[in-house]
Curated annotation (Swiss-Prot):
Keyword annotations from UniProtKB, A to Z: NADP, Oxidoreductase, Porphyrin biosynthesis
Role noted for this protein: Catalyzes the NADPH-dependent reduction of glutamyl-tRNA(Glu) to glutamate 1-semialdehyde (GSA).
Note in the entry: During catalysis, the active site Cys acts as a nucleophile attacking the alpha-carbonyl group of tRNA-bound glutamate with the formation of a thioester intermediate between enzyme and glutamate, and the concomitant release of tRNA(Glu). The thioester intermediate is finally reduced by direct hydride transfer from NADPH, to form the product GSA.
UniProt GO molecular function: glutamyl-tRNA reductase activity; NADP binding
Free-text note regarding domains: Possesses an unusual extended V-shaped dimeric structure with each monomer consisting of three distinct domains arranged along a curved 'spinal' alpha-helix. The N-terminal catalytic domain specifically recognizes the glutamate moiety of the substrate. The second domain is the NADPH-binding domain, and the third C-terminal domain is responsible for dimerization.
Active site: 50 (nucleophile)
Name this protein carries in UniProt: Glutamyl-tRNA reductase
Enzyme Commission no: 1.2.1.70
Complex formation: Homodimer.
Gene that specifies this protein: hemA
Catalysis: reaction(s): (S)-4-amino-5-oxopentanoate + tRNA(Glu) + NADP(+) = L-glutamyl-tRNA(Glu) + NADPH + H(+)
Residues noted as binding NADP(+) in the record, renumbered to the chain: 189-194
Site (Important for activity): 99
Length: 434
């Protein structure tokens, strides 16, 4: 049994190709049912997100399994293989396992360390188990992959550093204020990044939001969304006295707030820090405000600089994460290789147990005077002998199982020397008459 993986992602395929291969939940369910009917695949999991579509499968012949998955993509998406084969990546064995673990640990994501991918993979696994397309091999793979991702999150700082403008703004605010629980936010203007920054601040328990906009109707709508208070642009200066964090994104041709505007409220603020996040281009906030005591202005370039430094930090943490991934690849491979020897070990155990039971019955029949205590002693003695006899063959099989080229020979030799292919083994074993 081996693991194969075939797929495409943001690194290998443009968005127009990726969107052709995306599976929604209904399509994924139908796709899994189709995968279950492919004889070359023993088990399968379909992973589909906005940035990747991949199929991990267990199969007896890796090359046949890979070809079957390529054909599945071509048939289900009605696209000739030659139109997309150059966009596919193909892994087998340890490389396939490593890829699954790296994806779950967010080492293969567009944004290194982003947390969403693990939840998406758990959902993919849930759909596969629901469709009954997984068994012992992929169940073990996915559980180990989730454990690996959890260790990466716990033992490294790969997700600790903000790598988006909105998160970087929150990170800076926390450095200035510490806890944000009593801090008030003033949003001037609108825009996706500014609104996301407000959402993140509220998620960190900021005390409330004032919303000012060029049109008061828009301010009312945004305030309702954030459960805040709408104000008119003319009221912004007055609210500088009570706000702690100013987020501005108006797109106005000149500064919305100048140094003189802030200087007017310094006495009323009693030296409390004021943090400005200027996401507008051209800028809304006069950079000269930085020269005022306890006033901090960060524009889009400053925030990007924070992100660049944080990406470097995540890259350093990724080195530690890769080590955790590689460690778990080895552990999974050891388990998978041992899987092939289990039937032989079970057959050997059944044969020896049948011999033990038969010889016990014959011997005890010749000593009818033996009491229950004596029977238990003989039971323990014979069981101990069987366990000791089994020890060396099991260790031999496990050692041989690590060498792929010798595995079949080792298993065949063991079955021959113990005559395990004899249909009279196990429960039907009959000892030779003396």
């Amino acid at each position: 049994m081996d693991i194969v993986l075939v797929g495409l992602n943001h690194k290998t395929a443009p968005v127009d190709i990726r969107e052709c291969f995306a599976f929604d939940s209904l399509e994924a369910d139908a796709g899994l049912k189709e995968l279950s009917r492919i004889p070359e695949l023993t088990e399968a999991v379909l992973i589909s997100t906005c940035n990747r579509v991949e199929i991990a499968a267990a199969c007896q012949d890796p090359d046949e399994g890979i070809a079957a998955i390529k054909d599945f993509f071509s048939r289900t998406k009605s696209m000739p293989l030659e139109n997309f084969e150059q966009n596919l990546f193909v892994y087998k064995g340890d490389e396939a396992v490593q890829h699954v673990f790296r994806v779950a640990s967010s080492l293969d994501s567009m944004v290194l360390g982003e947390p969403q991918i693990l939840g998406q993979m758990k959902e993919s696994y849930r759909l596969a188990t629901q469709a009954k397309t997984t068994g012992a091999v992929l169940n073990r793979l996915m559980h180990r992959c989730f454990m690996t991702a959890k260790r990466v999150r716990k033992e490294t700082g790969i997700g600790d550093h903000a790598v988006s403008i909105s998160y970087a703004a929150v990170e800076l605010a926390r450095k200035i204020f510490g806890e944000l629980t009593d801090k008030k936010v003033l949003l001037i203007g609108a825009g996706e990044m500014a609104e996301l920054a407000v959402e993140h601040l509220l998620n960190h328990r900021a005390a409330g939001v004032f919303v000012a906009n060029r049109t008061f109707e828009r301010a009312v709508a945004l305030a309702e969304r954030f459960r805040g208070t709408p104000i008119r642009l003319e009221e912004v200066e007055e609210h500088l006295k009570i706000a702690d964090i100013i987020i501005s994104s108006t797109g106005a041709p000149g500064y919305v707030l100048e140094k003189k505007d802030v200087k007017k409220v310094l006495r009323a603020r009693k030296n409390r820090p004021l943090f400005f996040i200027d996401i507008a281009v051209p800028r809304d906030i006069d950079p000269a405000i930085n020269n005022l005591s306890n006033n901090f202005v960060y524009d889009i370039d400053d925030l990007q600089g924070v992100i660049d430094r944080n990406i470097d930090e995540r890259q350093k943490e990724a080195v530690r994460a890769e080590r955790i991934v590689d460690e778990n690849v080895i552990k999974y491979r050891t388990w998978l290789e041992g899987l092939d020897i289990v039937p032989t070990i079970v057959s050997l155990q059944k044969k020896l147990e049948a011999i033990r039971q038969a010889e016990m019955a014959k011997s005890l029949a010749n000593i009818p005077e033996i009491d229950e205590k004596g029977r238990e002693a003989i039971e323990r003695l014979t069981q101990s002998i069987i366990n000791k006899v089994m020890h060396d063959p099991i260790q031999f099989l496990k050692a041989g199982g690590h060498r792929e080229k010798q595995k079949k020979e080792v298993l065949g030799f063991t079955r021959d020397i113990f005559n395990l292919n004899n249909p009279q083994n196990g429960d039907e074993f009959t000892p030779d008459e003396e």
